[in-house]
Design a protein with these regions (language model features):
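Short helix/turn-capping signatures at newly exposed starts of structured segments
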Residues: 413-554
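Bacterial N-terminal signal peptides
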Residues: 7-14
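Residues that line or immediately flank small-molecule/substrate-binding pockets and catalytic motifs
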Residues: 8, 129-130, 552
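Short, structurally constrained coil/turn elements
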Residues: 14, 69, 442-445
């Protein structure tokens, strides 16, 4: 049995401002001023609470984007109405500009409203929307320049900035912001902008686009969540396709990292049990059946591991300080048998990146766990024991398990199924009622409007509200002829229910272990742990239950 470590991320808005003549919160100025206009020092606000609050949101969004291939823009706040743009990406100065009036317009929405505005502008920058507007300005007299300066192009840029900016704000921890139409109305009102313009989408069109974009964003988040759940239960090849679907639409270090993790874990299924004595600290970044081996298993696993290395390199290219990718790269090299490179990436790259500003303290501990495995495999038992013991004092459950393996201590037995045990339910629904809602039904109930076809053979379905505080995700893999359906029924915020063994949200890890025994599979995160049992998953934050998931395959 292999254990995996998972870290936690997540994914994800604005709109353009408008004057009667010019409209944008994007790549085109919204007032009478042109991009690059220099403000006097008095017009730029700093060292005041509003600026500090907005700067904190900006910094979190930049960190969540994790793309440092381009210089990070400077964030400035302009006094009052500034240049009349509300929020603006100034490419000449490489500044994201937020005006005081725009800040005040989104006050009631807190940091989530600011993330909506600022995330929109950062998306213009990272998606290089400025190239088009710059081309139009320089070659506007040519036919191609005139064609590019079309309303449809502006709509496309603004819609993409809403969509990917929303994903960015979500990934930075600000949730799915659903007040965009209200906020844009307040911005228009604050600036006295008209609702119609020849050169920009109308206010009503803008609001309609926001609602549609929110729906698309929800689908993308749901696909990402499904990928994480599939990874947790070991459906790695299937999870890879879900991650790939997201990566085509949104690129980030976490997505590339998770693509690589899926390949590493799939490769681990190609090892014999005696080849994987220890548990490797592979880290899946969340925001969440090995069969018989043929003669080509060794070459297949090497191919998978080398594919994983390419994905980790892509994540590192976006953010050279992203410690989890270095650690996962080290794990891949260790599994390839290259202990020299594995030790270098764990001891030097992963550890140094993790300890820089103490951004990834858990990853630093996990690096020690991997080095301990390398020492043990090299016969340096005492050094391995010291590393595992030190990591155990830092509350590493994985280190404790590896220490037991090193000492030949018996591991806790897997929980036994108890005859007559009350079935697990969420919102009063048994998994049987979810997977077979009507006797002899071939497919669970789902919302057709939310169906996504990821490939010709893989579909994602869901029932968004089987009960008041739960959701259902269904993966339909037609290539799997024995168990094509994987069904997850999970709690959502506010669920007051209990499991069959009286465990509820907020209960501690010890209570779960007392009720269910030690999990046969655990997945570490920087803020907690995922405990995977035969038909139930517990997701912990700070050793407290944040949500649980019932699941089945059929």
């Amino acid at each position: 049995m292999k254990a995996v470590l998972i870290s936690s991320i997540f994914l994800f808005c604005l709109l353009p401002g408008v004057s009667a003549q010019h409209r944008t919160i994007g790549t085109i100025p919204l007032g009478g001023t042109q991009p690059g206009t220099t403000q006097s020092p008095a017009d730029k606000m700093a060292a005041i609470p509003a600026y500090k609050q907005a700067l904190s949101v900006f910094d979190k969004l930049v960190e969540a984007r994790g793309d440092f291939r381009l210089p990070v823009p400077k964030f400035v706040m302009l006094k009052g109405k500034g240049n009349g743009n509300a929020a603006f990406m100034n490419y000449l100065l490489n500044e994201v500009q937020l005006e005081e009036n725009a800040f005040n317009a989104c006050k009631e929405y807190g940091d989530a409203g600011l993330a909506f505005l600022i995330g929109h502008e950062l998306t213009h920058y990272y998606e290089k929307h400025g190239w088009r507007s710059g081309f139009v300005q320089e070659y506007g007299d040519l036919p191609i320049g005139l064609r590019l300066n079309k309303l449809t192009d502006k709509v496309a840029n603004e819609t993409e900035a809403d969509y990917l900016g929303g994903f960015l704000a979500y990934s930075a921890g600000y949730g799915l912001f659903d007040k965009g139409p209200e906020l844009i109305q307040k911005v228009y009102t604050a600036y006295g902008w008209g609702t119609e313009s020849e050169n920009y989408p109308s206010l009503s069109d803008r609001q309609a686009l926001l609602l549609r974009t929110k729906e698309k964003l929800e689908r993308l988040i749901e696909v990402f969540e499904m990928a994480n759940l599939l990874t947790a239960i070991g459906s790695y090849a299937e999870a890879y396709e879900y991650y790939r679907y997201v990566a085509i639409r949104y690129q980030s270090r976490e997505i590339y990292n998770n693509l690589g993790v899926a390949k590493v874990l799939e490769a681990m299924n190609e090892f014999e049990a005696n080849e994987l004595v220890y548990r490797y600290p592979v880290e899946l970044d969340l925001s969440f059946s090995a069969g018989s081996k043929g003669s080509g298993a060794g070459s297949l696993r090497d191919v998978l591991l080398r594919q994983a290395l390419l994905q980790f390199d892509a994540a590192i290219s976006m953010d050279p300080g992203y410690a989890p990718a270095y650690l996962n790269k080290a794990c891949a090299y260790a599994l390839l048998g290259d202990s020299t490179r594995a030790r270098f990436y764990a001891d030097k790259e992963a550890r140094n990146a993790a300890l820089d500003n103490n951004q990834y303290p858990k990853t630093a501990v996990d690096a020690d766990v991997l080095i301990g495995i390398l020492e043990a495999k090299s016969g340096n038992t005492e050094q391995a024991k010291k590393l595992f013991q030190a990591a155990t004092t830092k509350d590493s459950k994985l280190a404790a398990i590896n220490l037991s393996i090193l000492n030949n201590d018996p591991l806790p037995p897997a929980p036994k199924e108890k005859v007559g045990l009350k079935p697990e339910t969420i919102d009063g629904l048994k998994m049987a009622a979810i997977s077979h809602p009507i006797d002899n039904d071939l497919f669970p109930k789902y919302d057709e409007a939310k169906t996504i076809e990821l490939t010709d053979n893989l579909g994602f379905n869901q029932n968004p509200a089987p009960g008041p505080n739960s959701k259902v995700y269904i993966s339909n893999n037609s290539l799997n002829t024995t168990e094509p359906l994987t069904i997850f029924h999970f709690t959502t915020a506010g669920n007051k229910g209990k499991t069959a063994k009286n465990i509820g949200l907020g209960d501690g890890r010890d209570a779960i272990v007392t009720a269910y025994g030690e999990a046969p599979r655990t997945i570490e995160t920087p803020i907690g742990q995922i405990m995977v049992y035969k038909q139930i998953i517990f997701i912990l934050k700070d050793n407290k239950l944040e949500r649980w998931v019932n699941y089945t395959r059929r």
